[in-house]
Amino acid sequence: DGKNGLLRRSSVSRYPDLELVNEDFQNPIQISNANPQQKDVYWPSVELVKWYSYDSVLLEGLMYLPENYDTTKRYPLMIYYYELNSDNLHSYRSPRPSASIINPIEYASNDYLVFIPDIRYEEGHPGKSAYSSIMSGTDFLLKKYAIDSLKMGLQGQSWGGYQTAQMVTMTNRYAAAMAGAP
């Protein structure tokens, strides 16, 4: 009738089910329930964080926190990177294992903090750019969140794998690193 439409909204913990909406988008009615098992998962929250790189470039990233995040407890930190990811702030991801990259929902649901920094590249200096983005982001997080600094890890796949392979030659700050397909 031209007065109703379908809508899909999502967030880190909201599956994008179909909703019927009127022309004013008031009182949407959920008409699908495609992921009922999600009620059995501890859902993290996600925050957009901003900090400055060592080169004074304003950066953004995503910080995933466990559902029952407690500032009196110290958490292990996993850092995953591949170019730019902060646009995924409101994206839904199912908590499932991956063959190649860490799933931030799965890790945060198991009491890890997960950081996904954007990497801004200086032409001709990808390794230096990744180092500046990741290390300065880690410095920022250590001041703001309850992180166990002895239990921090890096993970990158493909281009991110190359950056991981280079990062481990530039610092011993991280307890573990996984470079996939560098």
Language model region names:
Residues 2-182:
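Serine-hydrolase catalytic core recognition
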